[in-house]
Amino acid sequence: MTAEKAFGRRTFFAAAGLGLGLSLSGCGDRSTRSGASAPPPQASFVLAHAAAPTGLDPSRRTSQETSRVSTQVLEGLVAADRSTGEPSPALAESWVVADDRRSVTFTLREDVTFHDGTEFDAAAVKANFDKWQAQAESPEAWARQCAFATTFRHGSPDPRVSTCYAGVDVADERTVVLRLTRPYTPLLSALTQPAFAMSSPESIRAGTEDQHLVGTGPFRLDSATPESVKLLAHEDYWGELGSVGTLELRVVPDPEVRCAALLTGEVDAYDLVGLDDFAPLAREGIQVLYRDPYAVSYLGLNQRVRAFQDLDVRRAVAAAIDRGSLAKSLYPNGTNVADQFVPARFNVNGDNLQIPGYDPQHAKDLLKKSSYRGERLRFLYPRHTSRMYLQEPERVYAQISAQLTRVGFRLQPVPMDWDEGYLDAVSTPDGDHAFSLLGWSGSFRDPDSFMAPLLSAPQARLGFDDAGLMTAVNRAAGMPQGDARTSAYKTLNDRVSEEMPAVPLSHPVSAVAVSSRVVNYPLSSTGFERFNDLELA
């Protein structure tokens, strides 16, 4: 049973309503509050986003909405710098990486407490890591795809995938040592993910983190319903609170309705601007902010379906799809066609990519010589949602399905509401669907942010079992930064394109529209904006 199935939306919201040689040191500190007597912020701010979180614990959930809520309430040892994405001090003031790159010693910030009054100390850090380790070792299906499992390669039932996590030691109240079995190059960047933010040990013991977050962040949870999550500024926050006293994250699945809500003043901003809304917003002089492409949309090919065990069939799928037309007509301007799963910003584009270009006749020829015999293939796609990698999935499905049908595929459309467990359905190991529309949004600045969740294990999102490919992905993650690592990722991208575990479609741009109240919106390519950094007029 997946996490979403184990703890449904109705239960979550009911419960949430109840609880209100190398040595590197962190530098550049986030400011602490000028004084506890400073008046708390009074402004209210309402952001409309596309879906409700099915739970609040980012260590279990991978949705953008869960991360958006948790980023306001919880904090990690390190945070991503807004300008560079590089790790910067947060709950850890500084750190030192051992010469063999197999341990990091963190010095923790003093005088920080959780929202429930519990002291933040080394024991609290260990309690969180112990919880994450136990989750990754759980037999639950969702555990294979939680961030701790994919980052540390931990808990896989496959003996070919070995963990790089060795444990956390408490040296003293303000010092913890994170130990690895082997080097993991992007470790500090990976720890900036919302999934590695600290919850109160009391909430961990109570097992309530998925219903009521208790962290050290600038906001605390006030209430949650299927329509809205409300957060209040935490007056005893150790850092800068900013100008927002009440933050509401309102669920509005339809992009046109989100746009209308902004134009009528019901909300102050909304995420994931729909394709048809850019012109109306421009006519009204509404500011639209664009994120850099840091996601990939793809057409999933279920390898457990017999037809897709044939490489010719998989290549026929790619040749049938006009990915250039998709990127141009169904995504915002600035979206790039994807020939690989890793975005261009890392400069690891393969030198010999094998994804076929749009060629319907070639697709027909491949099908004719393949093992496919016209059997109907179930095509699962989400509806009533927008994602950073798939803003209008119904329209994407319509175009792709028409192109596949024209070259000879027989399809059975299977639409499914996102909030009714779509992500579970496409991630189920024994699912009987053949095609699925999905994607992945990068959560930290490294190619492994894409490779690990998609391809590091047979239980990864693409569900592709290739021992050599898995070994190469996991080896590249530990290589020191430099030309050799860059070359390894280029080779990996070439190899993935040859095997075609799925069809990469695009690296989409996503956009946020903001009202005239907003002076400075803390836009992030990952979507993990911190609203205490928001500046209002």
Report each predicted region and the residues it spans.
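Detector for C-terminal structural segments
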Residues: 12-19, 24, 321-348, 392-399, ...
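Aromatic- and charge-enriched surface segment that lines or borders ligand/interaction sites
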Residues: 93-144, 177, 307
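Ligand-site clamp/hinge motif
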Residues: 207, 227, 235-280, 293
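A bilobed periplasmic-binding-protein/Venus flytrap-type ligand-binding module shared by bacterial periplasmic
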Residues: 232-236, 291-316, 320, 329, ...
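Append "and occasionally in soluble cytosolic enzymes with long acidic Gly/Pro-rich linkers
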Residues: 309-402, 406, 491
